[in-house]
């Protein structure tokens, strides 16, 4: 485990602890997530703290002498003895955990979970990226004894924790619940702090680099390396390069403000079949590197019921990586660009950057992404609701504004159509807390609290 990651408190730790207490050996835990989000680190930290002993099998480095053990699981006593001798660790019944790290690299280990869980002597935690990609599961039986949770990049609160700030979000929760204004000066300070989070992002390695160096150029280098890693993965999955092309087009496609991601334009092929496109998007989704917002054709409580698989938008799972992707036209992004972004003085329309940050907050809170578009045929005007949340037996439309807004026509027209379905309306913007009739206007640094409310 990388020692420098120990400082980072992650919310998923409590989810893993809940699994351990409630499962009591009846299921294995599978932690999915994009590469470099910190899966291995948090799992090893959990194993050290919550068990007497543990064995970590990193399938990206172990040799065939370990992998071949999974070819025959008929003699578990031999299997466990071999592991203990190899790793020089004594396993304690019901007080040890075996970790399968990067389990997608050894599909038979994942398949073995069924017999291992049934045996019941130890707990099992699997971590993986690209774990649902077709080539990683085509030759095995997926065990039903797995409980899955997803690990995302660090959210804003986790980012503040990494900076040593354990009070701000608790105080902001109180402010949010009371709907009291902070005042312009304090709001500006909070916005600058949130923009710092957007620029650095939530990838642990990038956060660490910022803490150590306070140098945006070095942070950008870390993020570029992560992006290159993802692009290499996509080229391995899809040798035609189309998957990498779709990934690289995310910032430009969001900037176009189109009704949905124009996949055929991006891959420069209008003849490609719809099932091929669906397969590509599915692979991209399974990578956990992007967040997909699907168009909801009938915005009501069961948003998934009217999800349009052919109409969607793509967001980066990490807004910090999104920033680097946006300025990837040079070998590096100058500190001056980061400094102007931080002070909100860059002469560019970056509304989609804030939109990506809100999408990330929604996903981190455990929600799926949905949006809605509609047309006024009389005046030939298109309207769009950026995001829709389902709460209780109602829905909550959300519009994201990157600057001081004066109008909110889309959310008003949406209310005219679906007022009986709406619980609350939100505008997420860069200004202080306010209310416009029944519309809740919330600063973007409180966007995660909108999801929790």
Features from the language model and the residues they span:
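A cross-kingdom feature that marks ATP-driven nucleic-acid transaction machinery
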Residues: 2-6, 11, 20-21, 27, ...
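Interdomain hinge/linker elements that couple catalytic modules in large macromolecular machines
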Residues: 3-4, 164-337, 341-354
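Hydrophobic anchor at the beta1->P-loop junction of P-loop NTPases
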Residues: 31
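Conserved lysine of the Walker
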Residues: 39
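Short glycine-rich substrate-engagement loop in P-loop NTPases that contacts/grips substrate
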Residues: 61-94
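Conserved P-loop NTPase "ATPase switch" module shared by AAA+ and STAND
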Residues: 91-108
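Structural recognition of the conserved hydrophobic beta-strand(s) that form the central parallel beta-sheet
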Residues: 99, 123-129, 150
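Short regulatory helix/loop adjacent to the ATP-binding pocket of P-loop NTPases
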Residues: 115, 132-148, 160-165
């Amino acid at each position: 485990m990388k020692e420098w990651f120990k400082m980072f408190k992650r919310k998923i730790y409590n989810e893993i602890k809940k699994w351990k207490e409630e499962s009591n050996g009846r299921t294995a835990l599978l932690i999915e997530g994009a590469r470099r989000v910190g899966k291995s680190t948090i799992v090893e930290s959990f194993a050290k703290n919550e068990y007497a002993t543990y064995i970590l099998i990193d399938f990206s480095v172990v040799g065939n002498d370990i992998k071949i053990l999974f070819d025959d699981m008929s003699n578990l006593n031999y299997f466990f003895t071999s592991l203990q001798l190899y790793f020089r660790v004594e396993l304690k019944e019901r007080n040890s955990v075996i970790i399968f790290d990067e389990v997608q690299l050894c599909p038979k280990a994942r398949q073995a979970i069924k017999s291992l869980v049934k045996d019941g002597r130890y707990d099992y935690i699997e971590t993986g990226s690209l774990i649902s990609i077709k080539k990683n599961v085509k030759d095995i039986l997926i065990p039903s004894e797995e409980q899955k949770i997803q690990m995302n990049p660090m959210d804003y609160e986790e980012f503040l924790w990494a900076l040593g700030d354990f009070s701000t979000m608790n105080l902001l929760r109180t402010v949010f619940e009371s709907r009291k204004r902070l005042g312009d000066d304090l709001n500006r300070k909070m916005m600058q702090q949130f923009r710092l989070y957007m620029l650095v992002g939530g990838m642990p390695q990038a956060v660490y680099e910022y803490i150590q160096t306070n140098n945006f150029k070095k942070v950008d280098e870390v993020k570029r390396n992560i992006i290159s890693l993802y692009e290499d993965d996509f080229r391995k999955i899809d040798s035609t390069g189309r998957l990498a092309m779709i990934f690289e087009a995310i910032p430009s496609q969001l900037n176009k403000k189109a009704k949905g991601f124009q996949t055929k334009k991006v891959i420069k092929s209008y003849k490609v079949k719809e099932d091929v496109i669906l397969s590509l998007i599915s692979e991209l989704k399974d990578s956990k590197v992007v967040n997909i917002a699907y168009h909801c054709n009938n915005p009501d409580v069961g948003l998934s019921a009217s999800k349009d698989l052919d109409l969607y938008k793509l967001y980066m799972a990490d807004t910090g990586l999104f920033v680097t992707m946006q300025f990837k036209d040079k070998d590096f992004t100058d500190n001056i660009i980061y400094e102007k972004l931080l002070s909100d003085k860059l002469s560019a329309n970056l509304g989609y950057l804030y939109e990506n940050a809100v999408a990330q907050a929604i996903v981190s809170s455990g929600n799926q992404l949905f949006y809605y578009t509609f047309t006024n045929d009389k005046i030939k005007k298109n309207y769009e609701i950026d995001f829709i949340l389902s709460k209780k037996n109602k829905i909550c439309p959300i519009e994201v504004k990157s600057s001081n807004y004066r109008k909110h026509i889309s959310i008003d027209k949406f209310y005219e159509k679906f007022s009986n379905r709406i619980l609350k309306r939100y505008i997420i913007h860069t200004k202080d807390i306010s209310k416009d009739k029944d519309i809740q206007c919330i600063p973007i640094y409180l966007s995660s609290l909108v999801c929790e409310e």
